[in-house]
């Protein structure tokens, strides 16, 4: 593997289930098989991860898909062009509300998205303060919350102000009544519910399309200078993805997630059983049938930015920006 342009690689991640393939590739030695020595760096927030990737402290990162078109548009005030060769997860987030708020609004666990939207919007119109948090402005979670509110009132959805919280801080934030609800990926909805703080009232796949949520992101300049290194990284992570899809026993994977403090609650086939199997299903179906980035996903993200922020762009510009988000060298398959 001496032909690799770089052997020491810094990979940033946020503690969520959908960084699992990166962690598993390291644990199983798949990076080492490719001649790579990887340093896994846990970041405090999406903003810090974005900045450290843009300024070269990280070579590669577990990244929000919407960060890429946002950077291309200059919305994040970055001078870096971000690209992805690989999807890490597709749309699989949830909206949770405080349990006492659910009781006050008569929201039951089996409620549908339209009903939960109607009851929250009605509370907002009655000036019953309902503060909602997203993980970052440029994320499917942000768009999911807006589209959820828009099921009832598009104007309110467009003008609604959201708070921002890193995924690992969601449980603490709702427990301390910093906000009343949030949209985030797992395992943070499950943890907040198990600890008695919130209930899940909506699922993102029932609100927005099955677009890429997290991707493996690099700066375009770094990718152009390190094509063989990037190919090796993708090969290792794809091997981990394939392994996770096929494994019948995820006990080692579970232990790894506990070690990384991603799973911080007791959950097994004997305790919180439905949550246990839900997490296993998410791990096995993280990226759907294909982990290849799709032009239509980034086109949808750009359309959302245009819809909610009135960003002007022609159809040709939208296509060009969407294409620029995808690393063009074909990823190696396992």
Spans of model-derived segments:
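Short, glycine-/small- and polar/acidic-enriched structural segments
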Residues: 3-155, 180-187, 197-203, 209-210
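General small-molecule cofactor/ligand-binding pocket signal
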Residues: 39-41, 161-165
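Short glycine- and hydrophobic/aromatic-rich loop-to-beta-strand nucleating segment
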Residues: 95-96, 215-218, 222-223
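Inter-helical turn/loop segments and adjacent helix faces that build the functional surface
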Residues: 155-160, 224-229
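Loop-centered beta-sheet repeat module
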Residues: 165-219
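Secondary-structure end/capping motifs
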Residues: 227-321
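C-terminal non-catalytic accessory extensions
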Residues: 328-334
């Amino acid at each position: 593997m001496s032909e690799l342009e770089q052997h020491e690689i810094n990979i940033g991640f946020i503690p969520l289930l959908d960084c699992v393939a990166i962690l598993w590739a390291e644990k199983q030695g798949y990076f080492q098989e490719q001649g790579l020595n990887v340093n896994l760096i846990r970041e405090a927030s999406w903003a810090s991860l974005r900045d450290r990737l843009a300024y070269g402290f990280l070579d590669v990162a577990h990244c929000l898909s919407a960060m890429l078109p946002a950077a291309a548009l200059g919305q994040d005030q970055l001078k870096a062009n971000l690209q992805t060769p690989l999807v890490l997860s597709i749309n699989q987030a949830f909206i949770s509300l405080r349990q006492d708020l659910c009781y006050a609004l008569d929201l039951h666990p089996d409620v549908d998205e339209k009903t939960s939207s109607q009851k929250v919007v009605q509370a907002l119109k009655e000036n019953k303060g309902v503060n909602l948090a997203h993980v970052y402005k440029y994320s499917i979670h942000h768009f999911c919350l807006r589209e959820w509110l828009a099921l009832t009132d598009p104007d309110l959805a467009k003008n609604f102000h959201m708070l921002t919280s890193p995924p690992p801080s969601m449980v603490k934030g709702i427990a301390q009544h910093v906000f009343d609800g949030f949209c985030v990926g797992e395992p943070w909805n499950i943890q907040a519910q198990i600890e008695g703080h919130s209930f899940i009232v909506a699922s993102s796949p029932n609100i927005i399309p099955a677009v890429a949520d997290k991707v493996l992101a690099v700066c375009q300049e770094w990718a152009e200078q390190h094509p063989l290194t990037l190919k090796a990284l993708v090969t290792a992570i794809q091997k981990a993805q394939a392994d996770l899809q096929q494994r019948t026993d995820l006990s080692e994977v579970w232990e790894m997630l506990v070690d990384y403090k991603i799973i911080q609650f007791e959950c097994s086939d004997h305790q919180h059983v439905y949550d246990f199997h839900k997490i296993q299903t998410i791990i096995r179906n993280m990226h759907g049938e294909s982990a290849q980035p799709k032009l239509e996903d980034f086109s949808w993200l750009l359309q959302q930015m245009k819809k909610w922020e009135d960003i002007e762009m022609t159809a040709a510009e939208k296509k060009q920006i969407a294409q620029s988000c995808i690393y063009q060298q074909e990823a190696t398959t396992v």
